[in-house]
Amino acid sequence: MDTALKRSRSDEPAELPPPAREVEEKEEEEERMEQGLEEEEEEVDPRIQGELEKLNQSTDDINRRETELEDARQKFRSVLVEATVKLDELAKKIGKAVEDSKPYWEARRVARQAQLEAQKATQDFQRATEVLRAAKETISLAEQRLLEDDKRQFDSAWQEMLNHATQRVMEAEQTKTRSELVHKETAARYNAAMGRMRQLEKKLKRAINKSKPYFELKAKYYVQLEQLKKTVDDLQAKLALAKGEYKAALKSLERISDEIHERRRSNAMGPRGCGVGAEGSIASVENLPVSKPEPDAISVASEAFEDDNCSNLVSEDDSETQSVSSFSSGPTSPSEMPDQFPAVARPGSLDLPSPVSLSEFGMMFPILGPRSECSGASSPECEVERGDRAEGAENKMSDKANNNRVLGSTNGGSGRSRSQSSTSLESQALETRMKQLSLQCSKGRDGIIADIKMIFIFYTFLQ
């Protein structure tokens, strides 16, 4: 038995000590982090790679253009310094002849410039002449074909073609006129410059021959410097273009970065839900009971008290019957009365143990009117109402007495004294009863008004 237990224990794998477990957990966490980083690197927006390549290319172009521009400027400066030094040495060597021959060389430069302008004006004039000749030939051919073909009609298309040809002829004539004027002006300037140059050449022939090496070297350096200046301008334009591409790539990367950050922020925040407390309020509204509210003890007691008073009034007086009938025509049960007020959740301590709700009180006593109309037993409206009811009762009693008298008069003379005594007794009983009813009515209304005040206080507190 012991040997079997030892064998089973030896077969079980030995548990690792706590430090070894912690090392393994750390290694697993590092592997997970590396996997997460690899996944993030895989999810990089492909546009970033393209924009980064453009950015690197623009950086290389900017560096290369800046180097080339610096070399060109350095070369321009070196050539300028070299020309200045050599021309100064040559001017000192030649001496005064350089200054004396300057007017001739200046006139020669102006004549050369006028010659170039005249040549350009001559080319423009020849081109305008050729265009005018071609337009005139087009019009002549169109007219000739129209005249040769007897069947051809002079339609709108033919008219439009002739109009275009005529317009080209007019434009060519205007261009020819302008180029002819320019050619005449440039030719006149060229002739004047050549005349002045020949005149100065005859006058300053010796100084011109002596200073000729100086001005030839100066012209050579001038052409070289012009070429270098053009190269510098081209490199500056290319550098500005490379900087523009670099700026555009930076803006694209910034836009992509903003989009990525916005997407991450929206993913972290999640979809927008309801506001704080919105779910609770919605749930409370949905869970509100749809059943009718329970009546309370005060409304039931007031209803019973009013029913008792009204039943007494109905049995004694017809006028009271009308008022009670108007009262009974309204809804008397909670199921018949509409809900004037929505159901509102309230604390359990304020619930009244009664089968009638406070919201139905206004429908149960329509005869009393609003609260402002009868606010107490001493109100003038209530006094007037009680007086009217008492007067109506007295009128009824007088009518009944008159009827009894008429009936007594129709009877024999023997029963007249008996009818009069019975009528007087009946009238006294009626008057006593009316006084009791008026007192009961006033007391009942005072109690009802007090109950109404209490109910309004409770209703206001609940709201």
From Swiss-Prot:
One of its GO terms (cellular component) is mitochondrion. Its main location: membrane. Keywords: Coiled coil, Cytoplasmic vesicle, Guanine-nucleotide releasing factor, Membrane, Mitochondrion, Phosphoprotein, SH3-binding. It is a peripheral membrane protein. Residues 323-335, 416-428 have a biased composition (Low complexity). Residues 47-93, 100-148, 157-203, 214-258 form a coiled coil. One of its GO terms (molecular function) is SH3 domain binding. Residues 1-12, 45-54, 383-399 have a biased composition (Basic and acidic residues). The modification Phosphoserine is found at S354, S378, S379, S421, S424. It is found in: Cytoplasmic vesicle membrane; Mitochondrion. Residues 33-268 are annotated as: Sufficient for interaction with RAB11A and for guanine nucleotide exchange activity. Residues 25-44, 309-320 have a biased composition (Acidic residues). Transmembrane segments: none annotated. The N-terminal half of the protein mediates interaction with RAB11A and functions as a guanine nucleotide exchange factor. Four long alpha-helices (interrupted by a central kink) assemble into coiled coils, giving rise to a 'V' shape. Interacts with BTK. Interacts with all isoforms of MAPK8, MAPK9, MAPK10 and MAPK12. Interacts with GDP-bound and nucleotide-free forms of RAB11A. Belongs to the SH3BP5 family. Functions as a guanine nucleotide exchange factor (GEF) with specificity for RAB11A and RAB25. Inhibits the auto- and transphosphorylation activity of BTK. Plays a negative regulatory role in BTK-related cytoplasmic signaling in B-cells. May be involved in BCR-induced apoptotic cell death. This is SH3 domain-binding protein 5.
